[in-house]
């Protein structure tokens, strides 16, 4: 796989494998690569722009009011902080692709940017698991723990998630380097794996620890959450004919589906990449298919960081309440001639789905 270097990982364990002498033998899609070089940077900058604004706004809404965060807000604020750090590194990769993978920023940023990307992969999914687990405890086992205990556990959990995410990104930080590629006349930021066994370790870390195991936990928690909500909805309809918790149900489904849609393609192509490395699949078709697929899947997964403010916050009622509280706190009374009750009605109509 000579023509591309996906931001998260590299495909080869040594430079001779990465850049064979007949590097253009499988260059069967030059038009596709030219299109990617033109389109992807704009796409990445758009993700950075909206992700920066969205996650900054989320953090401001959570942190500006001078009161203690509840459990859900602790997790969501950490998720926004992780995504904010991540999107700050995207302009570097946009410039890298504009230059056709010629890395102009030096060895240190090569390591730091890719380490941040790798850490975000784990931190985000682990936070999704933590959010699902907390909601599972609240809705399925409401008497299992008290609110103060849950808040303390949420803080500890978030610290551990950041530490674990940082530790799992250490190999990327240590093994990333810039290498000259004379055949292509570029200096690339690449990950050189020192031994063939690292390919297996990488797929275990990336696909199993970073996707399949968290996905199993998310499915387990959300299945029981949805079952509990359906039971409550049936009871509610029987007693008062109303629909309750429909917003929560929709939010949970949105979380799971959005995560799968954004990240499943990347892990699929990462697994195909592993099969190519162990020569389970061969040929130019698979090389070009995996190279191009990884590029697209990488940055499609990145959209999750700009969607998180919408998916995890704006879809739910929690954030709407926080925005309203912040609005009342920051709006001078002299600038509010209408009554607070009318203002609240207008605000509720504005946010009504």
UniProtKB/Swiss-Prot annotation:
GO terms for biological process: cell migration; G protein-coupled receptor signaling pathway; inflammatory response; negative regulation of blood pressure; negative regulation of cell growth; positive regulation of cytosolic calcium ion concentration; positive regulation of leukocyte migration; positive regulation of release of sequestered calcium ion into cytosol. GO terms for cellular component: endoplasmic reticulum; plasma membrane. The chain crosses the membrane at residues 41-64, 74-98, 112-133, 156-178, 200-226, 248-272, 292-314. SUPFAM superfamilies: Family A G protein-coupled receptor-like. A lipid is attached at residue 330 (S-palmitoyl cysteine). Its main location: membrane. It holds the Pfam family 7tm_1. Disulfide bonds join 110-189. Residues 65-73, 134-155, 227-247, 315-353 are cytoplasmic. It comes from the Eukaryota. Keywords: Cell membrane, Disulfide bond, G-protein coupled receptor, Glycoprotein, Lipoprotein, Membrane, Palmitate, Receptor, Transducer, Transmembrane, Transmembrane helix. InterPro entries: Brdyknn_1_rcpt (IPR001186), Brdyknn_rcpt (IPR000496), CCR1-9-like (IPR050119), GPCR_Rhodpsn (IPR000276), GPCR_Rhodpsn_7TM (IPR017452). Glycans are attached at residues 14, 22, 185. It is a multi-pass membrane protein. Residues 1-40, 99-111, 179-199, 273-291 are extracellular. Belongs to the G-protein coupled receptor 1 family. Bradykinin receptor subfamily. BDKRB1 sub-subfamily. This is a receptor for bradykinin. Could be a factor in chronic pain and inflammation. PANTHER family: B2 BRADYKININ RECEPTOR (PTHR10489:SF957), CELL ADHESION MOLECULE (PTHR10489). This is B1 bradykinin receptor. The lineage of its organism: Eukaryota, Metazoa, Chordata, Craniata, Vertebrata.
């Amino acid at each position: 796989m000579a023509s591309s270097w996906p931001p998260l990982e590299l495909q080869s364990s040594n430079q001779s494998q990465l850049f064979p002498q007949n590097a253009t033998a499988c260059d069967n899609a030059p038009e596709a690569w030219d299109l990617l070089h033109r389109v992807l940077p704009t796409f990445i900058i758009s993700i950075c722009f909206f992700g920066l604004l969205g996650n900054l706004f989320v953090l401001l809404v959570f942190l500006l009011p001078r009161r203690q965060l509840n459990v859900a807000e602790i997790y969501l604020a950490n998720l926004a902080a992780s995504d904010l750090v991540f999107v700050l590194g995207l302009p570097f990769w946009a410039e890298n692709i504009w230059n056709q993978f010629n890395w102009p920023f030096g060895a240190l940023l090569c390591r730091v940017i890719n380490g941040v990307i790798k850490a975000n992969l784990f931190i985000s999914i682990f936070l999704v698991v933590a959010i699902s687990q907390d909601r599972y405890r609240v809705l399925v086992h409401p008497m299992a723990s008290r609110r103060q205990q849950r808040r303390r556990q949420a803080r500890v959990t978030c610290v551990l998630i950041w530490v674990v995410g940082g530790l799992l990104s250490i190999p990327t930080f240590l093994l990333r380097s810039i290498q000259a590629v004379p055949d292509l006349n570029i200096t690339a930021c690449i990950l050189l794996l020192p031994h063939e066994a690292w390919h297996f370790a990488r797929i275990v870390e990336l696909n199993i620890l970073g996707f399949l195991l968290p996905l199993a936990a998310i499915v387990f928690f959300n299945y029981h959450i949805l079952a509990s909500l359906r039971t409550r909805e049936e009871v509610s309809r029987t007693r008062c004919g109303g629909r309750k918790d429909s917003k929560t149900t929709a939010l949970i489904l949105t979380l799971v589906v959005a995560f799968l849609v954004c990240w499943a393609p990347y892990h699929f192509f990462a697994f195909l990449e592993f099969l190519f490395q162990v020569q389970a699949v061969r040929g130019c078709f698979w090389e070009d298919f995996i190279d191009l697929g990884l590029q697209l899947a990488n940055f499609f997964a990145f959209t999750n960081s700009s969607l998180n403010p919408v998916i995890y916050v704006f879809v739910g009622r929690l954030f709407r309440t926080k925005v309203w509280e912040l609005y009342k706190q920051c709006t001078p009374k002299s600038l509010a001639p209408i009554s607070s009750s009318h203002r609240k009605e207008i605000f509720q109509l504005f946010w009504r789905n």
